[in-house]
């Protein structure tokens, strides 16, 4: 299975350059003639409308007509006056790549470009021309949202850190307010609540709301659109707010702590059903859901680590992905008042925490496929749809470039990875510990699943050096013990973080051999990209604070 596992949802790139000419209503002058027996005078009554729908009257709006307009002219103007004016987008899609900043989507783009480029060279590191044989790099293959009409950057700091968490940054995006890391839609004292854009659209404009995530639906980012808690870890209370929100569509990962931290409370799924939600746990039942079901919660059938959706690299082709949940969400939510849909690619963040570049790229591409569903929908509603793609923060300190590869990258090496670090832990490390498997036998699986070889041709870019083999052996020996990350010394933490020593060393070495590296197991302070397409897209050009994402959406949607 290639790392770049696509869902055949991408259109030709030309479809993505969707600069559309919009028909803007100009001022219409309505005239009536009052004839006098001796002298004639014309009276006018004018109405004007501008592109921002802020109508004003002035002398310049008044037009004096000395002759009666023809019947044809009056009819044409009357018809024009009946044309409905689009004042705000009817359909809004907000895609958030958790942990996705410039390095994540650029790495995915570069990787696709490398796979598609027959001249992409895996030569010895060199900045000269001698080893290139005339080959010329074609460059990255841009992800669909990288071709959007508008592109901006958002600063992500919160009230306590330049390297913030998902709770505070999602709060900024959803409400336009800063707060401390770990807090969801409340101020720094934990006493003042902030109303979210989704809540306002639901209440003020009767728009339907959808919330999708590849991780838990009561995790920090999705929770930021409906919950208000001083701690992001209050999963049960957040789950209760999910039900109380009355939002029409939730889909993706499962709920954490469904019976509370002590497993002594009423099941959240039962509470949801009592509140009128239809809850599904199988793909077959999810496929049967229609708009008539009104309020639904679709839990992915193939939940993996921590009851989240599988990593994209581990997903079978017949299993639903984020794009499928977006597609079903459109079916459920579409109505005359429109809808707002937030879709989170949450496992980008989890993969970056674990320093797994292969899984990171795969889940970034899964988010891109989900975006394509919205793009296809927007082609049917070009003047009514706004699509936004952004991140909440950067995770892992991912960088394209590594000291050991100098000025070169070997990104196609990543195609050798077949499974995520998480699946390797679950399906292989557990077996090794149970059976007392030797290091040499374990390395046979590593070669099959990650391409790293202990023996082979010296020109093979995935052939391990003696130094790398010793790193892997030391990590394996530690992983076979009852190790505890809490007892790590500083050197061990830098090498392994809180992850299985063997699996994280495997991904570190594969990353480095590909010309990729990470600097952290946590978040960083990089700005995130903001890409916009459709109604009001130009508002999102520029460099601004992440609270402005909310402010710009609120302005376009005319909410208080």
Which residues does each PLM region occupy?
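Bacterial N-terminal signal peptides that target proteins for export
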Residues: 17-28
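A post-motif C-terminal structural segment
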Residues: 86-91, 100-105, 109-171, 219-560
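Short, Lys/Arg-enriched N-terminal segments with co-localized hydrophobic residues
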Residues: 1-17
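Extracellular mucin-like PTS domains
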Residues: 55-76
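Sec-dependent signal peptide cleavage junction
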Residues: 37-55
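Extracytoplasmic mature domains of secreted/periplasmic and thylakoid-lumen proteins
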Residues: 177-240
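Bacterial N-terminal signal peptides
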Residues: 29-37
């Amino acid at each position: 299975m290639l790392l770049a596992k696509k869902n055949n949802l991408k259109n030709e790139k030309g479809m993505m350059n969707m600069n559309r000419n919009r028909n803007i209503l100009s001022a219409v002058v309505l005239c009536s003639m009052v004839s006098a027996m001796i002298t004639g005078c014309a009276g006018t009554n004018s109405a004007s409308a501008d592109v921002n729908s802020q109508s004003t009257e002035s002398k310049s709006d008044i037009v004096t007509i000395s002759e009666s307009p023809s019947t044809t002219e009056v009819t044409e103007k009357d018809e024009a006056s009946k044309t409905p004016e689009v004042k705000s987008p009817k359909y809004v899609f907000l895609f958030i790549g958790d942990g996705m900043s410039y390095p994540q989507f650029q790495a995915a783009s570069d990787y696709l470009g490398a796979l598609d480029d027959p001249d992409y060279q895996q030569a010895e590191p060199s900045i000269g021309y001698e080893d290139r044989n005339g080959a010329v790099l074609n460059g990255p293959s841009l992800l669909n949202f990288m071709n959007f009409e508008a592109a901006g950057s958002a600063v992500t700091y919160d009230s306590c850190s330049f390297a913030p968490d998902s709770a505070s940054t999602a709060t900024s995006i959803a409400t336009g307010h800063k707060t401390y890391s770990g807090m969801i839609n409340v101020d720094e004292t934990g006493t003042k609540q902030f109303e979210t854009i989704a809540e306002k659209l639901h209440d003020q404009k009767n728009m339907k709301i959808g919330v999708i995530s590849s991780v838990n639906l009561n995790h920090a980012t999705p929770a930021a659109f409906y919950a208000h808690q001083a701690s992001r870890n209050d999963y049960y209370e957040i789950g209760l707010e999910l039900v109380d929100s009355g939002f029409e569509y939730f889909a993706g990962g499962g709920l954490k702590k469904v019976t509370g931290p002590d497993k002594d409370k009423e099941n959240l799924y039962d509470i949801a059903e009592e509140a009128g939600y239809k809850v599904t746990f199988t793909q077959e039942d999810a496929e049967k859901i229609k708009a008539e079901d009104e309020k639904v919660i679709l839990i992915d059938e193939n939940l993996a680590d921590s009851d989240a959706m599988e990593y994209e690299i581990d997903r079978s082709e017949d299993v639903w992905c984020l794009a499928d949940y977006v597609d079903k969400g459109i079916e459920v939510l579409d109505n005359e008042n429109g809808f707002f849909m937030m879709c989170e690619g949450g496992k980008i963040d989890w993969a970056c925490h674990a320093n797994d570049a292969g899984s990171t790229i795969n889940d970034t591409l899964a988010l891109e496929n989900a975006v394509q569903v919205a793009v296809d929908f927007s082609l049917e509603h070009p003047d009514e749809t706004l699509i936004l793609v952004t991140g909440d923060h950067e995770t892992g300190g991912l960088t394209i470039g590594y000291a050991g590869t100098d000025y070169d990258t070997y990104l196609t090496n990543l195609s050798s990875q077949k499974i995520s670090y998480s699946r390797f832990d679950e399906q292989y490390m557990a077996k090794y510990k149970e059976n007392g498997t030797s290091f040499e036998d374990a390395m046979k699986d590593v070669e099959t699943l990650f391409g790293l070889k202990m023996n082979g041709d010296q020109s093979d870019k995935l052939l391990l050096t003696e130094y790398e083999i010793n790193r892997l052996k030391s990590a394996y020996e530690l992983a076979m013990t009852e190790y505890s990350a809490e007892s790590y010394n500083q050197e061990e933490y830098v090498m392994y973080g809180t992850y299985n020593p063997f699996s994280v060393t495997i991904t570190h070495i594969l990353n480095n051999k590909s010309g990729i590296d990470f600097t952290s197991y946590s978040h960083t302070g990089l700005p995130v990209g903001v890409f916009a397409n459709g109604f009001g897209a130009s508002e999102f050009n520029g460099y601004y604070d992440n609270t402005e994402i909310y402010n710009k959406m609120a302005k376009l949607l005319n909410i208080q």
